[in-house]
Swiss-Prot record:
Record carries keyword DNA-binding: no
Gene designation: acpS
Major subcellular location class: cytoplasm
Alphabetized InterPro entries for the sequence: 4-PPantetheinyl_Trfase_dom, 4-PPantetheinyl_Trfase_dom_sf, ACPS, Ppantetheine-prot_Trfase_dom
Any one GO BP annotation for this protein: fatty acid biosynthetic process
Gene Ontology CC entries for this record: cytoplasm
SUPFAM superfamilies: 4'-phosphopantetheinyl transferase
Protein's recorded name: Holo-[acyl-carrier-protein] synthase
Subcellular localization, as worded in the UniProt entry: Cytoplasm
Function: Transfers the 4'-phosphopantetheine moiety from coenzyme A to a Ser of acyl-carrier-protein.
Amino acid sequence: MVFGTGVDNVELSRIQKALTRSERFVEQVLTAVELEKYNSFQSTARKTEFLAGRWAAKEAFSKAYGTGFGKALGMHDLEIKNDELGKPFFTKHPFDGQVHLSISHSNLEAVAFVVLEKN
């Protein structure tokens, strides 16, 4: 049974501006594991795309979960990895059930869709 759905999109230029304003922005969004992956990318464009995708995915999760971000849920309560085929999935989350995630990018924005499913 579907518990909740969430979608979020973010312009890559908005993420780039946030990176310019604050050196800590990346650390506020990404966990240590995600930060390691982020730092493995050579190009600024790929780093921005990766960060935007993670931002959108975490925002989409918070909407599907029904709390948004705040005391009940923070960015570091969520962690995303990719499987051997590149499909993103949450490795860390507070939801008791299945979490389905899709992330897509264009040269202008990133979008993510999350479905939370109770067993």
